[in-house]
C-alpha cells in the first residue's frame, strides 16, 4: 500500500515537471509528453490517507484520471511551424506573400489609420496561400476594429511598431472591445511590437475611481481572440489596456508566449490575460504586472497550462470568480508550474460565489515563489460582494475538488499565509499541500481537512 502511494506521488512529481518550456527566441510548438497512463494502474483502495468527509487527492485521482485531464493536448498545427530564426511562418508550399498596412494608406503619424488596417486585413484574409501582414515600426492610431474570419489564407500578423487606441471614449459607444479577432483559424500574431490601449482616460472615469454617474460606462477590452482555433500569440508588449488586456474566449489550441503585459498598479480591472470557455491553452514565459489579476481563468476553460510566469503588481493568478448570480460554472485541468509573484494582493486564488453551482477540479500549483503577497494561498467558496448582493440565504456552492499545492515558497505581507474558506454545504475535497513553506503568516481552514505531505508550514 505504502509503495503504491509513493509511486503515485512520484508520478505526480514527474508529471508536473515534464512539460516543455518555451524559448522566446525559438519555436512555440512543442508536443507535451507525459507519463499519464501510469495512473490507470493504481488501486485507490490502497492509496493511504483517507477521510470520508474530505477525500484525499490520491483517493479521488483514480477513476477521474485527473492527470490526463490536466494534461494540455496542444496539437502541432497542420503543415505550419514557427521559424526558429525569424519567428515567422514556414510552410511546405510556396513562400508567404508579404503586405504592409502602409500599402493600404496607413501613415503612422498620429492620423487615424483605422480604414487602412481594415483594408489590409481584408486583402490578407481573402488571399490564398500563406500571407504575412506587417505593421511597420511606426505609431499607428486606430479606432475599434474587428478582424473577422474565416480567412482563406494561413495568416501571420507581424507587429514591429505600435498600435495605439484613440483616447476618444465616444467612438466606442456600446462596443466592449478595441481590437477583436473573430473566427480566424491558424492565426499567428507576433511582435516584437506594442499594443497600447491608452487606458488612462478610462481608468479616471471607472466606478472604482469615480463612483458617481455615469461611471457605469463599460470599458473595452484591449485585445480579444474569439473562436480562434490553433492560435499563436508571441513576443508582444501589451500595455495600458482600457480594461482587460487580452481575452481568449471560445478558443481551442492556443499558445501564448513571451508576452509583456503592463499597466499601473492602481489601474482598475486591468486583468493581464483572461481565459474563458477555452480549451488546450498554454501561457508561458511571460511577465505580467497590472491593476488586477495577472491571469484569470473562468467558466468553460479546460486544460489550461501556465508556466514561467512573473506576476506583480496585481491580484495574482486566479481561478474564478465562478458561480455569480447562481450560475453553473465549470473549470478543470489547470496546471500552473513555475511562477514568481511579488507584492500582489493574492497569490494562488480560487474564488467562487455563494449560491453558485458547478465545479473547479483537477488543479495543480507547482514550483511557485511568492514575496510579500497579501494572501499567498486562498480558496474562497463563500465569496459575496455585500455592496451589491444579498448572499445570506444562499446555501449552494461551486464544488472545489482535487487541488494540489506543491513546492510553494515565500512570505506573506499580511499575517495570512493559507486561507481555505470552504463551503459548509459543499465542502472542498481532495486538497493537498506538499512541500509548502510560507513565512510570516498563519493558516486557517474551514470545512476542509487538507492532506499534508513533506514539510508544510504553516498548518491549520
Swiss-Prot record:
Pfam families recorded: Glyco_hydro_28
EC number(s) on file: 3.2.1.15
Position of the signal peptide: 1-26
Glycosylation sites per record: 280, 421
GO cellular component: extracellular region
Gene3D superfamilies cross-referenced by the UniProt entry: Single-stranded right-handed beta-helix, Pectin lyase-like (2.160.20.10)
InterPro entries tied to this protein: Glyco_hydro_28, PbH1, Pectin_lyas_fold, Pectin_lyase_fold/virulence
Entry's localization field: Secreted; Secreted, Cell wall
EC top class named in words: hydrolase
Catalytic residue positions: 292, 315
Signal recorded as keyword: yes
Record PROSITE patterns: POLYGALACTURONASE
Domain of life, per lineage: Eukaryota
Function according to Swiss-Prot or TrEMBL: Acts in concert with the pectinesterase, in the ripening process. Is involved in cell wall metabolism, specifically in polyuronide degradation.
The protein, known as: Polygalacturonase
Taxonomic source organism: Malus domestica (Apple)
